[in-house]
């Protein structure tokens, strides 16, 4: 069995050959003035076949890119979710990893169904974990948001009172 890097190398070799062939076809499509034979002219059907082949190639690459991007985002979300559960001391739910956390109307994650009640003895001190849990909820909400760049939240210093700044508009 060949390694993944060997397979990728073979793919790029095949892509190089395909682009070489595309270059040759392009040169045939745009012949130099009088040096080409009369039969070298492309028909509309042949040009359309080439256009369709190049378009399919681009579409296929875009599809592959989307699949990889979705898988990568899902892996990042799963890793962050697992880290949040580990940091908060709550066991990771046993449900399918493909299911994302559910949002409630306020945009904050609902508590996991397998989480122990707050009054149980397995919950650590009341001072530390709630702050971590609050930060984790905001982070997961931002990651699960469909428009990832519109609602990014800076969670550093969350819970701290920011220093008050007064602006003096009376200065000339």
Curated annotation (Swiss-Prot):
Chief place where the protein resides: nucleus
Localization terms from the record: Nucleus
Modified residues (Phosphoserine): 96
GO molecular function, one term: DNA binding
Gene label: BACC1
InterPro entries: Homeodomain-like_sf (IPR009057), SANT/Myb (IPR001005)
Biased composition (Pro residues): 110-119
SUPFAM superfamilies: Homeodomain-like
Domain of life of the source: Eukaryota
Keywords tagged on the record: Chromatin regulator, DNA-binding, Nucleus, Phosphoprotein
The protein, known as: BPTF-associated chromatin complex component 1
Region ranges (Disordered): 87-172
Residue spans of biased composition, Low complexity class: 120-130
Species name: Bos taurus (Bovine)
Gene Ontology CC, one term: MLL1 complex
């Amino acid at each position: 069995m060949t390694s993944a890097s060997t397979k990728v190398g073979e793919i790029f070799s095949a892509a190089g050959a395909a682009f070489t062939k595309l270059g040759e076809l392009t040169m045939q499509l745009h012949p130099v003035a009088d040096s080409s034979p009369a039969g070298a002219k492309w028909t509309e059907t042949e040009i359309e076949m080439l256009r369709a082949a190049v378009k399919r190639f681009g579409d296929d690459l875009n599809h592959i890119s989307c699949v990889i991007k979705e898988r990568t985002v899902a892996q990042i979300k799963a890793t962050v979710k697992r880290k949040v559960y580990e940091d908060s001391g709550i066991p990771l739910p046993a449900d399918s990893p493909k299911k994302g956390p559910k949002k409630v109307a306020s945009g904050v994650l609902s508590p996991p169904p397998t989480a122990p009640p707050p009054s149980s003895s397995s919950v650590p001190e009341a001072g530390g974990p709630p702050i971590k849990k609050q930060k984790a909820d905001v982070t997961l909400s931002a990651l699960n948001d469909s428009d990832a760049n519109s609602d990014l939240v800076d969670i550093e210093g969350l819970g701290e009172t920011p220093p008050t700044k007064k602006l003096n508009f009376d200065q000339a």
